[in-house]
């Protein structure tokens, strides 16, 4: 991977808004290098990492909420597999709003095949909320995802 260090760094950013966490919600996002027809030669793309941060709130009294934010990636064999989890949770004694937040970076280092100059690099991801206890319609979550890519001509 040392030969990638001189390659330009590019990011791909997404925001997933979950206004309610009832029913194990999920959203699909696509990581893209947006380099179609911008270079004169074919290129390779290295998907370096996926950084995830989130914040959210929940309402109620004597509430214990917890779950997992699952990030999955559609792999080359067509199967969507988890790349990692970030715990969500909090406890609240009084009838009020509680808050939770978290962050994590997943190192991927996935190298693409050579791409023609007239095609974009694309990789699908699924952002899912897994309910372990109490995540419901009185809970919300906003997730921020940044993919780091390196482009090599």
UniProtKB/Swiss-Prot annotation:
It is found in: Host nucleus; Host cytoplasm. Signal peptide: none annotated. It comes from the Viruses. Pfam families: Nanovirus_C8. GO terms for cellular component: host cell cytoplasm; host cell nucleus. InterPro entries: Nanovirus_C8. Disulfide bonds: none annotated. Keywords: Host cytoplasm, Host nucleus. Belongs to the nanoviridae nuclear shuttle protein family. Putative nuclear shuttle protein. This is Putative nuclear shuttle protein. It comes from Milk vetch dwarf virus (isolate N) (MDV).
């Amino acid at each position: 991977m040392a030969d990638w260090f001189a390659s330009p760094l590019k990011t791909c950013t997404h925001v997933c808004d979950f206004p309610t966490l009832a029913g194990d919600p999920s959203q699909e996002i696509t990581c893209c290098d947006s380099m179609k027809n911008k270079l004169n030669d074919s290129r390779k793309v290295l998907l370096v990492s996926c950084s995830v941060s989130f914040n959210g709130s929940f309402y109620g009294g004597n509430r214990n909420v917890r779950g997992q934010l699952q990030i999955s990636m559609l792999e080359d064999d067509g199967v969507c597999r988890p790349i990692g989890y970030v715990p969500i949770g909090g406890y609240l004694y009084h009838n009020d709003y509680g808050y939770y937040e978290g962050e994590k970076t997943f190192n991927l280092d996935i190298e693409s095949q050579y791409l023609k100059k007239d095609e974009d690099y694309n990789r699908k991801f699924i952002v899912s909320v897994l309910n372990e206890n109490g995540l419901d319609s009185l809970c919300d979550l906003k997730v921020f995802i940044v993919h780091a890519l390196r482009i090599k001509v």
